[in-house]
């Protein structure tokens, strides 16, 4: 039951949507059952939803599973090992929703950081900063939804990109070009229509498809390249209903070398830090759900 409070002005106030938990639990799991060790490096967030009204309206903590308990559960479950980040989140979600009657759902998210072996060494690694793998699990009653993703994957094409035919007005100074550098930091999230997935294999496949489409599409606009990247994923993976992407256009401007008596045949550029174009889109399977609630808690995507 929802409690209603009435203020001195007669305004009625009720508790709306809410969730709580422990954010960014730093977890490093070393699997050392052989001489060749494996590293899993995660940043895990656990947030619960359910009957927590009394905690908000009366300070009654009878239903409040402490955020410290949620943190401890992450570490305790890691001791048992896990194959993929998504499977780890599914186990956490199952534990909290089945272990506490008043917890009807929640949100569990993780970032996964990669480590590469140093010269194929058994237990020495260097941090791979080329990308971060992401995963979000949302449970609402009996429904489960997973969004996986990749962020910070920086890519560049030194040719094979054009930009022309755009509107011009009195504020337009950008020159048209038929040969430019195209560079971006790929951030992509894709929503599965099932949780029965080989998550590692699909992640590797999606990553490869995104890179292949970026490399092979002769680009007339970053929007076109983005669409081709998303289309390749949707056409290849029936278990994915939609993919959202956010691609900043990392501008590279040709430097004028004429003051120094030199030409510049598209070889010397200034890499601009900001401002930058920001291109975002959703590419989805026709007929699939376009407004899944899991996206309401994933910022930065249209």
From Swiss-Prot:
Homotetramer. Keywords: Oxidoreductase, Purine metabolism. It catalyses: urate + O2 + H2O = 5-hydroxyisourate + H2O2. The active site is at 22 (charge relay system), 67 (charge relay system), 251 (charge relay system). One of its GO terms (biological process) is urate catabolic process. PANTHER family: URICASE (PTHR42874:SF1). This is Uricase. It is an enzyme of class 1 (oxidoreductase). It comes from Arthrobacter globiformis. Pathway: Purine metabolism; urate degradation; (S)-allantoin from urate: step 1/3. Its EC number is 1.7.3.3.
């Amino acid at each position: 039951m929802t409690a209603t409070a009435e203020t001195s002005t007669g305004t009625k106030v009720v508790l709306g949507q809410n969730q709580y938990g422990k954010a960014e639990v730093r977890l490093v799991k070393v699997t050392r059952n052989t001489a060749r060790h494996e590293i899993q490096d995660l940043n895990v967030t656990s947030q619960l939803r359910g009957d927590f009204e009394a905690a908000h309206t009366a300070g009654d903590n009878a239903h409040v599973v402490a955020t410290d308990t949620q943190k401890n559960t992450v570490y305790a479950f890691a001791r048992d090992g896990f194959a993929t980040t998504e499977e780890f989140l599914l186990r956490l979600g199952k534990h909290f929703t089945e272990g506490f009657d008043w917890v009807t759902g929640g949100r569990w998210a993780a970032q996964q950081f990669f480590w590469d072996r140093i010269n194929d060494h058994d237990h020495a690694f260097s941090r791979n900063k080329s990308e971060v793998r992401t995963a979000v699990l949302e449970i609402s009653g009996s429904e489960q939804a997973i969004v996986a993703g990749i962020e910070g994957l920086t890519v560049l094409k030194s040719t094979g990109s054009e930009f022309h035919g755009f509107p011009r007005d009195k504020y337009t100074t950008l020159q048209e070009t038929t040969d430019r550098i195209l560079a971006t930091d790929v951030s992509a999230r894709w929503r599965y229509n099932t949780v029965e997935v080989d998550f590692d294999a699909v992640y590797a496949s999606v990553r490869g498809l995104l890179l292949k489409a970026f490399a092979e599409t002769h680009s007339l606009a970053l929007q076109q390249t983005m669409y081709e990247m998303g289309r390749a994923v949707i056409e290849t993976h029936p278990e994915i209903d939609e993919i959202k992407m956010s691609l900043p256009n990392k501008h590279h401007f040709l430097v004028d070398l004429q003051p120094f008596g030199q030409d510049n045949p598209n070889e010397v550029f200034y890499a601009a830090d900001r401002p930058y174009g920001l291109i975002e889109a959703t590419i989805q399977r026709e007929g699939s759900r376009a407004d899944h609630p899991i996206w309401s808690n994933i910022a930065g995507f249209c």
